[in-house]
Amino acid sequence: MKNINWNDVQEATERRDLPVGGYVAGICKATDEPAKERLNIEWEVAEGEFKGYWREQTASLIERGKLNPGEWAWGGKTIKSYKEKALPFFKGFITAVEQSNPGYKFNNDEKTLRGKLVGVVLREEEYMGNDGNIKTKLVVDRFTSVDKIRSGDYEVRPKKTLAGASGSGYSQSGNDDFSVIEDDGSLPFD
């Protein structure tokens, strides 16, 4: 074995996994992709036991060389399409943001979403890993008002399974192309 200076190695700490449930989140960045008619939303847990969770995950991934500086951990990202058929869902997102930020009215400028609070409900979803095995990840199931999250007035839906695994009819599409964000260490809603 090679000689390692153990005084220079930080011991691993217990890993906290973000559980399914509802969270008060802060929007860190919203980037428009006009050609695809969608917003890339980068968010962070803003309150409670898991406040700052995605920042911690991002720092850990950068430290281990699995993410480039300035990028945001994949789990703290979601896409909201504003294509014609998706407008009711986009409207639901905007309504949740407006209800969560008294006096705020969305004016079709995605940059105004930065620093706004919104309720996020996470659920588990199965996907096919590169190794051919079915894996599970957390995804944003829906957005709601922060008041509903704080009062517990939301429901976590059951895990979404792959077709064939339980006959759900679900098929996965890849949405892993997100923009790099600049990070000065602060969150816009702190």
Question: What are the functions of these language-model segments?
Answer:
Residues M1-D190:
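Short beta-rich binding modules
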